[in-house]
Regions:
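N-terminal "cap/leader" segments of large eukaryotic alpha-helical scaffolds
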Residues: 37-57
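Structural detector for internal amphipathic alpha-helices that build alpha-solenoid repeat scaffolds
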Residues: 37-38, 56-78, 89, 93, ...
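Alpha-helical repeat scaffolds
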Residues: 242-249, 278-281, 309, 402-406, ...
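Charged (often Lys/Glu-rich) extended helix/loop segments that serve as interaction or gating elements
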Residues: 642
């Protein structure tokens, strides 16, 4: 054992010595697998040699090596110089066009003024002109500008067009005289005009303006667009005089495309300084410049000066009136409301609607009656605009004016619109006049008053609504009276007290028709404290009252009436009442879709046991599929033996089986 440990220690020490020796050797003489030294990075010459045959195929290692080589040296002056020299030489070699294009892409990153002569000479050769221009156009400074200007004079065909475009992109101001001379050459006029617009400046703008009048019709829009660009540049440089000259040349020309002329008209107003108001008013007088002029009104005329514009309203086209009304919506109401009001009588639907919308923004109390009148007369979009505007008017004074107008008993159509506004605006102080409107001889007014009460009323208003429902209203009022009673009752926080007023009225009521209507309210309010009252009424001596009570329990919207409808279904001898009770029971069972299926089916079986007619069994079968389980299948199969409901039973079996199969798959 001792000898074994000693040997192990020896080998451990020896292993450490060998490992150290290997590390030292590796540092002193790095080797790779097989004893070969690692390959040295490829030189640029090697990379370009490999790239020279590249034709766009998959094998693109040289492409990426060139990219990495250039990127590694683009911030080093000596490295850039090497890359520039060798890539320029490569551009004149027999390399493939694809390879030269790739090289040119990298040349534009590192090339400087020293590369310009070589690139300029390449521009003279159609075979290399595109690649040379690709690199040259990205070299900043006057040397490259000069080369391109010289090339513009000597190049031909597509190369010349490309050089002109490049000078425009570079915004080479010194090229303007040469480019301007080409505006009269059909083959070059378009690109020359575009280039001058991109260069901008007063000289370029003047050159374009000088050629505009004599330009062919097809070229005029191009020159005009470039003149606009020059004018915008001048405006940005605070040279309003130069900009104005260009705009004044273009704005009177009706032959220009509408967007171009509109821009010229707007620009002329913008560049006119203190004279902008007069220019704008002049443009308002011309139908073809109205739209552009209106778009600048808010920039030129303040609240104290807007009256100058309002005098033009009658002279504007309908389209112009609509646009001006939209602009006036942002002005103080006391300055513009009279002019807006006048347009409410326009024969144009569009103008009237625009006026209504504007009144919603700028109107005050004085706009209440005109808007209510408009809403009462109009239909469709115009009526909707009037109602929206009446609801949008701002301020308590508007609310007070609406109440005042209602108190003056206006025509029924107007009163209806004012009552609608009371509800929309939630004018709670209007409740006295709204309550008074419940006494109106007009059914339309009464209905709108009921709707307004739903928004502003309180449970204390229920007695007045019940008076209308039971004593004064006609059939057209009753549906809204019921809805209003329910809406007011729902505002009572204690759910078990919501039907108190109705129950009190019912207890003292002797008239059958009134009792029936009151009973019909109870399931709509759904206060479960009313169920004992209904149970008692189900045994009343008045058959109509009994029928109403049974129907109320059968229609009860919550499970609180479950046992009541079970008792009805079991005990009643009236077939109609049994059908109603079974239908109510089935509906109540179906209210809880997440109930245990077995328990729900047990209740449905009770309903089936009470059923003696096919109509009643069909109600049960219709609900079975909501609770898929074995018990549901058993009940459906039992009813399958009944010929009168066989089809319904089979449909229930199919639905239950399908749902059970899905549940098995999910599990």
């Amino acid at each position: 054992m001792f000898m074994h440990r000693q040997v192990s220690r020896v080998w451990s020490v020896a292993g450490g010595i060998i490992a150290c020796a290997l590390v030292v050797g590796a540092v002193a003489c790095p080797v790779t697998l097989g004893g070969q030294a690692p390959a040295r990075p490829a030189s640029l010459d090697q990379i370009l040699t490999e790239l020279s045959t590249y034709d766009g195929g998959i094998a693109s290692d040289a492409v990426w090596r060139l990219r990495d080589y250039v990127n590694a040296r683009k911030d080093d002056a000596a490295g850039r110089a090497e890359c520039e020299e060798k890539i320029l030489r490569f551009m004149t070699s027999p390399a493939t066009p694809v390879a030269k294009t790739i090289a040119a892409r990298h040349l534009r990153v590192i090339a400087g003024d020293s590369a310009v002569p070589a690139l300029q000479s390449m521009l003279a050769d159609e075979r290399s002109a595109d690649m040379a221009l690709y690199a040259l156009r990205q070299i900043p400074g006057g040397v490259a500008d000069g080369a391109l200007i010289q090339a513009m004079a000597t190049a031909t065909g597509a190369t010349r067009v490309a050089v002109i475009a490049a000078l425009g992109e570079r915004r080479t101001a010194s090229a303007v005289p040469g480019i301007a001379s080409m505006l009269t050459q059909p083959a070059l006029a378009t690109v020359a005009a575009i280039a001058l617009g991109r260069i901008g400046g007063s000289e370029a703008g003047a050159s374009l303006a000088a050629s505009y009048a004599a330009a062919p019709a097809g070229l005029k829009p191009v020159i005009a667009s470039s003149m606009l660009a020059c004018a915008e540049t001048a405006l940005a440089a605070k040279d309003s005089a130069s900009a104005l000259r260009l705009y004044e040349t273009l704005s009177p020309d009706a032959s220009l495309p509408i967007p171009v002329r509109k821009a010229a008209v707007i620009g002329r107003i913008s560049a006119s300084g203190t004279g902008a108001g007069g220019v704008l008013l002049s443009d308002l007088s011309a139908p073809d410049t109205q739209e552009a002029a209106i778009s600048k009104i808010a920039d030129v005329f303040g609240p104290d000066d807007i009256h100058q514009v309002l005098t033009f309203m009658p002279r504007l086209s309908d389209r112009g009136k609509v646009q001006l009304l939209a602009v006036l919506s942002s002005y103080p109401g006391d300055r513009v409301v009279p002019a807006v009001m006048q347009t409410l009588a326009s024969p144009s639907d569009a103008v009237r609607i625009a006026a209504l919308k504007a009144l919603g923004s700028v109107g005050g109390p004085a706009a209440v009656r005109p808007l209510a009148d408009a809403a009462s007369r109009a239909r469709g979009g115009e009526q909707a605009a009037a109602r929206t505007a009446l609801g949008a008017l701002k301020g308590r004074a508007v609310d007070e004016e609406i109440v005042t107008q209602l108190a003056q008993r206006p025509p029924e159509a107007v009163a209806g619109e004012l009552l609608l506004a009371v509800g929309d605006r939630r004018i709670f102080p209007a409740k006295p006049v709204v309550s008074a409107a419940l006494m109106s001889p007009s059914s339309k007014v009464r209905v709108q008053a009921l709707k307004a009460l739903r928004a502003i009323g309180t449970p204390s208003d229920i007695p007045a609504v019940l008076d209308l429902l039971l004593d004064r209203g006609d059939q057209s009022d009753r549906v809204d009276a019921e809805k209003t009673t329910v809406a007011l009752a729902q505002k009572i926080e204690n759910a078990d007290g919501r039907s108190r007023t109705v129950k009190t009225r019912l207890a003292g009521e002797k008239r059958t028709d009134a009792r029936v209507r009151l009973i019909g309210l109870l399931p709509l309010i759904a206060d479960s404290s009313a169920l004992p009252v209904l149970r008692a009424l189900a045994a009343d001596g008045d058959a109509d009252v009994v029928d109403a009570a049974v129907r109320a329990m059968a229609a009860w919207p919550t499970p609180a009436a479950r046992e009541d409808v079970v008792r009805l279904a079991r005990d009643t001898r009236d077939q109609t009442h049994r059908l109603l009770a079974i239908g109510g029971l089935v509906r109540i069972i179906g209210l809880d879709k997440y109930r245990d299926p077995q328990a729900a089916v047990a209740d449905l079986k009770r309903a089936s046991d009470f059923s003696s007619r096919p109509e009643e069994q069909k109600l049960v079968l219709g609900a079975l599929a909501q609770f898929p389980c074995a018990a549901a299948l058993d009940l459906a199969n039992k009813l399958l033996r009944e010929p009168a409901v066989k089809a319904e039973a089979q449909a229930a079996i199919d639905k239950i089986s399908a749902r059970l199969s899905k549940e098995v798959i999910r599990k």
